[in-house]
């Protein structure tokens, strides 16, 4: 009678090796995740991929339950990092332009487009004109150019948007408020690039009175609507 062959000793413990590898990878991942120093996103993604995958083709798999979403969670970290950079830029802009914000010459906000630096036209331009009041605006525009050139905004693109109110009458030869708003955006661009901002990172738009932020029924609302927005674009609006 033939004797039964005994299974190799190592085969019965194959699941233990797989489980041990998974635990080790998880430990490395969470140590790096909660390390207070800067985290390399690429490394985290590689670790997550190793955890979620099943390198042995058998045994215990981490591809089910909460661990199944681990790779997706890590993939969201670059977006989170970019959001944090934009929040940091917003805080820096508020501090940098504090005097102009206090005097209502500049407003710093954020919306679905990205970070927005709004120049009040009455403080930067002559009434009905695309000519800049250089004496009043030069120092502020220099700081705007320096801010846009900061390494923290590397890779970002900018859009300069001109806006008017519903009653402003062009006095600089512009045929209408569409042309006036566009000319003002162009004029701001020229000053920013003269002060060192990179021209190839900009785009321009003139919206006349079609993008009002406040009601045009009051003088105060119209004054705030007369503006030039410098938008640090979120990636989805490139």
Swiss-Prot record:
Residues 35-238 are periplasmic. It is a single-pass type II membrane protein. Residues 112-236 form the OmpA-like domain. Residues 1-14 are cytoplasmic. InterPro entries: Bact_OuterMem_StrucFunc, MotB-like_N_dom, OmpA-like, OmpA-like_sf. GO terms for cellular component: plasma membrane. The keyword Hydrolase does not apply. The keyword Transmembrane applies. CDD domains: OmpA_C-like. Pfam families: MotB_plug, OmpA. The chain crosses the membrane at residues 15-34. It is found in: Cell inner membrane. Keywords: Cell inner membrane, Cell membrane, Chemotaxis, Flagellar rotation, Membrane, Transmembrane, Transmembrane helix. One of its GO terms (biological process) is chemotaxis. Belongs to the MotB family. MotA and MotB comprise the stator element of the flagellar motor complex. Required for the rotation of the flagellar motor. Might be a linker that fastens the torque-generating machinery to the cell wall. NCBIfam families: PRK06667.1. Each stator complex is composed of 4 MotA and 2 MotB subunits. 2 A subunits and 1 B subunit are thought to form a single ion channel, so that each stator complex contains two channels. This is Motility protein B.
């Amino acid at each position: 009678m033939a004797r039964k062959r005994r299974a190799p000793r190592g085969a019965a413990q194959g699941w233990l090796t797989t489980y041990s590898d998974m635990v080790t990878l998880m430990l490395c991942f969470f140590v790096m995740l909660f390390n207070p120093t800067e985290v390399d996103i690429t490394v985290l993604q590689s670790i997550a991929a190793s955890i979620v995958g099943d390198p042995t083709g058998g045994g215990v798999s981490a591809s089910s339950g909460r661990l199944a979403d681990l790779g997706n969670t890590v993939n969201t970290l670059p977006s989170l990092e970019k959001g944090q950079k934009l929040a940091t830029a917003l805080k820096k802009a508020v501090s940098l332009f504090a005097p102009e914000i206090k005097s209502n010459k500049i407003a710093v906000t954020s919306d679905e487009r990205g970070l927005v630096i709004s120049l009040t036209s009455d403080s930067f331009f002559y009434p009905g004109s695309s000519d800049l009041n250089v004496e009043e605006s030069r120092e502020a525009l220099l700081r705007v150019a320096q801010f846009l050139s900061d390494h923290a905004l590397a890779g970002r693109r900018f859009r300069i948007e001109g806006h008017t109110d519903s009653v402003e009458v062009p006095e600089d030869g512009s045929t209408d408020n569409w042309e006036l708003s566009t000319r003002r955006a162009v004029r701001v661009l020229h000053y920013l690039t003269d002060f060192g901002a990179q021209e190839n990172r900009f785009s321009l738009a003139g919206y006349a009175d079609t993008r009002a932020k406040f009601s045009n029924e009051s003088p105060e609302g119209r004054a705030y609507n007369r503006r030039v927005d410098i938008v640090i674009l979120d990636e989805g609006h490139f």
